[in-house]
């Protein structure tokens, strides 16, 4: 009986659902044994979106959502195991990212906050949980993000071939794997799907722009594009990370206020170009050519992929499927891997990426007993 399974739980800034993966690490290449996506109920999603912005009675809302999200994460694990026909006794630990509700690493007392009570997950599943992966890195002077570049390096690096792994979730982040002994570079480029999702939700009450079809029907307004790309984040040096605290619907409405004459589809096209141009600028600053593999929800946006391809003529553009891991499961597997690293007493961060003063074992253990 295999007892070397780890589970990864991930809910990103898009908050489009909880990804749960069961991974076998008994061989050098991880094997994805089972996968499950759990929808976040609408009332919980509304409260999470509310909590991501400053408001009243935040502590009460935070406490209740911490438990609610923990229960959802626990249910996702139980559903995953039922699907796979695997008993809880075969799982070493769950690596839970949690749901980020605030990420502000650049304050004098920088912090990041993920909810989804790991004690609740442990009790609901009967499996030890490793969680709170980001705050050790922040305690060491780092950004606490992105953390997945260490996993990207382990799984996707290729000698003598520069590669970029680009994750496009709510926020987009890239990992530059130089193919040499040089340091891996990784950082958040800026908005991924967060602005295009916010705009289509506001105008059409749709969760996302499928295939980027609405953006494709519009024409980018160069003046608005230039205005949005003038945000100071885009010119900051790395290491850097961001989130919905900077790029959200309120910011979008404020920035677009003087552009009310624009067609709604033209605004969507412009927002998609904010994502594509910010990614392309940072990519070209690292290397003019190479291989670029996309993961995350953005990999399924055909208009986004097409525009990126045009902006990066020196790159061979594809998805992480070509490297053996489907785009939607990369981050979940990464947190299963981080749980395994914690279990083995191994570091999980890359100081060159996060800015931390040293490598460290990430996460805390929450026993099921």
From Swiss-Prot:
UniProt-listed Enzyme Commission number(s): 2.7.1.170
SUPFAM superfamilies per the UniProt record, alphabetical: Actin-like ATPase domain (SSF53067)
Keyword Ribonucleoprotein in annotation: no
Principal EC category: transferase
Positions annotated to bind ATP: 12-19
Pfam families for this protein: AnmK (PF03702)
MF terms in GO: ATP binding; kinase activity; phosphotransferase activity, alcohol group as acceptor
Protein keywords: ATP-binding, Carbohydrate metabolism, Kinase, Nucleotide-binding, Transferase
InterPro entries named among the record's database cross-references: Anhydro_N_Ac-Mur_kinase, ATPase_NBD
Pathway linked to the protein: Amino-sugar metabolism; 1,6-anhydro-N-acetylmuramate degradation; Cell wall biogenesis; peptidoglycan recycling
Catalytically driven reaction(s): 1,6-anhydro-N-acetyl-beta-muramate + ATP + H2O = N-acetyl-D-muramate 6-phosphate + ADP + H(+)
Intrachain S-S bonds: none
UniProt KW Ribonucleoprotein keyword: no
GO biological process, one term: amino sugar metabolic process
Known role: Catalyzes the specific phosphorylation of 1,6-anhydro-N-acetylmuramic acid (anhMurNAc) with the simultaneous cleavage of the 1,6-anhydro ring, generating MurNAc-6-P. Is required for the utilization of anhMurNAc either imported from the medium or derived from its own cell wall murein, and thus plays a role in cell wall recycling.
Similarity remark: Belongs to the anhydro-N-acetylmuramic acid kinase family.
Name of this protein: Anhydro-N-acetylmuramic acid kinase
Gene name, Swiss-Prot/TrEMBL: anmK
């Amino acid at each position: 009986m295999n007892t070397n399974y780890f589970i990864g739980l991930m809910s990103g800034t898009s908050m489009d659902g909880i990804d749960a993966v069961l991974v076998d690490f008994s061989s050098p290449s991880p094997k994805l044994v089972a996968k499950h996506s759990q929808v976040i109920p609408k009332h919980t999603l509304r409260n999470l979106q509310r909590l991501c912005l400053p408001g009243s009675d935040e502590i009460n809302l935070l406490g209740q959502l911490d438990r609610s999200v923990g229960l959802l994460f626990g249910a996702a694990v139980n559903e995953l195991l039922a699907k796979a026909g695997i008993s809880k006794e075969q799982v070493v630990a769950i690596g839970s990212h949690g749901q980020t509700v605030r990420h502000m690493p650049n304050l004098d007392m920088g912090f990041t906050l993920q909810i989804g009570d790991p004690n609740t997950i442990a009790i609901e599943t009967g499996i030890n949980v490793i969680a709170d992966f980001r705050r050790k890195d922040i305690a060491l002077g780092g950004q606490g993000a992105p953390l997945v570049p260490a996993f990207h390096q382990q799984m996707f690096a290729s000698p003598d071939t520069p590669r970029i792994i680009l994750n496009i979730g709510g926020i987009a982040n890239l990992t530059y794997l130089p193919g040499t002994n040089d340091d891996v570079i990784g950082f958040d480029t800026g908005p991924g799907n967060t602005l295009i999702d916010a705009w289509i939700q506001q105008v059409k009450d749709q969760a996302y722009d499928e295939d980027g079809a609405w953006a494709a029907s519009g024409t980018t307004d160069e003046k608005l594009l230039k205005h949005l790309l003038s945000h100071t984040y885009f010119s900051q040096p790395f290491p850097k990370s961001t989130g919905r605290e900077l790029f959200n619907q309120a910011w979008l409405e404020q920035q677009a206020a003087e552009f009310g004459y624009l067609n709604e589809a033209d605004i969507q096209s412009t927002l998609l170009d904010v994502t594509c141009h910010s990614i392309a600028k940072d990519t070209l600053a690292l290397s003019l050519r190479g291989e670029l593999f996309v993961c995350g929800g953005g990999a399924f946006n055909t208009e986004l992929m097409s525009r990126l391809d045009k902006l990066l003529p020196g790159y061979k553009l594809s998805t992480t499927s070509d490297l053996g891991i489907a785009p939607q499961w990369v981050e979940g597997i990464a947190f299963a891997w981080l749980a395994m690293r914690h279990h083995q007493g191994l570091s999980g961060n890359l100081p060159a990426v996060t800015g931390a003063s040293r490598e460290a074992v990430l996460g805390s253990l929450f026993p099921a007993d």
